[in-house]
């Protein structure tokens, strides 16, 4: 009996919507990363993108524990000398709440072309509205 290996053209991808209201950032991100990679499926194959599409709503209501709201810093560089910018979790959640979840999930994905392709299936929105109703996403409780 041969081992079944998933092929890119035979992979079935579902759409899921996750409400991030009052969810812990790390616990939410690990489940999102797992489903983007397809590790929850029986036909998971490491070299094939078998993951599902994930739509995250209410990103502005995600929580962190302890003092991380003030202490956790996010860094970016403008590309100019001395252009290192930093922003705390509190400020970033007000400025760009989508980036908090995107950054957390990106750190859990493979750092190669396949990981970047998997990350494109993540759609994060600050509020409860999203433009993916035509895909009929299934609500996922985490």
Curated annotation (Swiss-Prot):
Pfam families: Ribosomal_L13. GO terms for biological process: negative regulation of translation; translation. Signal peptide: none annotated. SUPFAM superfamilies: Ribosomal protein L13. CDD domains: Ribosomal_L13 (cd00392). The keyword Hydrolase does not apply. InterPro entries: Ribosomal_uL13, Ribosomal_uL13_bac-type, Ribosomal_uL13_sf. GO terms for cellular component: cytosolic large ribosomal subunit. The keyword Ribonucleoprotein applies. One of its GO terms (molecular function) is mRNA binding. Keywords: Ribonucleoprotein, Ribosomal protein. It comes from the Bacteria. PANTHER family: LARGE RIBOSOMAL SUBUNIT PROTEIN UL13M (PTHR11545:SF2), RIBOSOMAL PROTEIN L13 (PTHR11545). Part of the 50S ribosomal subunit. HAMAP family: Ribosomal_uL13 (MF_01366). This protein is one of the early assembly proteins of the 50S ribosomal subunit, although it is not seen to bind rRNA by itself. It is important during the early stages of 50S assembly. Belongs to the universal ribosomal protein uL13 family. This is Large ribosomal subunit protein uL13.
């Amino acid at each position: 009996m041969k081992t079944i290996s998933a092929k890119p053209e035979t992979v079935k991808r579902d759409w899921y919507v996750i409400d991030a209201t009052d969810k812990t950032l790390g616990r939410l991100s690990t489940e999102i990363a797992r489903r983007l990679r397809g590790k929850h499926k029986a036909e998971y194959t490491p070299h094939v993108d078998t993951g599902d599409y994930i739509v995250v709503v209410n990103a502005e209501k995600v929580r962190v524990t302890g003092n991380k709201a003030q202490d956790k810093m996010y860094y970016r560089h403008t590309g100019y000398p001395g252009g290192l910018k930093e922003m705390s979790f509190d400020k970033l959640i007000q400025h760009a709440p989508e980036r908090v979840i995107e950054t957390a999930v990106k750190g859990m994905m493979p750092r190669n072309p396949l990981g970047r392709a998997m990350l494109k299936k993540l759609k994060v929105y600050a509020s409860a509205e999203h433009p993916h109703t035509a895909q009929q996403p299934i609500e996922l409780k985490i």
